[in-house]
Amino acid sequence: MIQAQSYLNVADNSGAKKIMCIRVLGGSQRKYAAIGDVIIGVVKDSVPNMSLKKSEVVRAVVVRTCKGIRRENGMTIRFDDNAAVVINKDGNPKGTRVFGPVARELRDRNFTKIVSLAPEVL
C-alpha cells in the first residue's frame, strides 16, 4: 500500500536508488497504490553520472510491496521492501535490468517487458 510521501527502492539500473511517491495515478481521489499500479515520484537518491538525477520527476510502476496481495487461490504474497521500476510514457522500463523478484500480477497489467527482465517471478 503506497501513498503520497512513501519512499520506494528502485529495482532497476536507471540511475535512481530511492524515489518518493507524490501521486497515485488512476483517479482524482485515489489514495493507495498496490502492485502493478503506476505512480509519479521524485528521485531522492541517485547514482552519480547516470541519466536520472536527484529531484527529477518520474513515472514508476510498483513491483513489490510490504503489504501482502491476495490471490484467487487464497495465497498471500508479501515482500520485504517497497520497490518500483522507473518507466517512460509508453510504459517501457528506462533501465535495462531489473533486480529482485517481481509479482506475477504485472503480467496481467501488461508490463510484460518488466516481467521478462526480472530474474524471478513469484
From Swiss-Prot:
Source organism: Mesostigma viride (Green alga)
PROSITE patterns: RIBOSOMAL_L14
Known partners and oligomeric status: Part of the 50S ribosomal subunit.
Keyword annotations from UniProtKB, A to Z: Chloroplast, Plastid, Ribonucleoprotein, Ribosomal protein, RNA-binding, rRNA-binding
HAMAP family in the cross-refs: Ribosomal_uL14
SUPFAM superfamilies on file: Ribosomal protein L14
Gene Ontology biological process: translation
MF GO annotations: large ribosomal subunit rRNA binding; structural constituent of ribosome
Protein role: Binds to 23S rRNA.
Gene name of the record: rpl14
Family, similarity comment: Belongs to the universal ribosomal protein uL14 family.
Cited InterPro entries: Ribosomal_uL14, Ribosomal_uL14_bac-type, Ribosomal_uL14_CS, Ribosomal_uL14_sf
Protein name: Large ribosomal subunit protein uL14c
Regions crossing the membrane: none
Compartment annotation: Plastid, Chloroplast
SMART domains listed in its UniProt record: Ribosomal_L14 (SM01374)
Annotated GO CC locations: chloroplast; cytosolic large ribosomal subunit
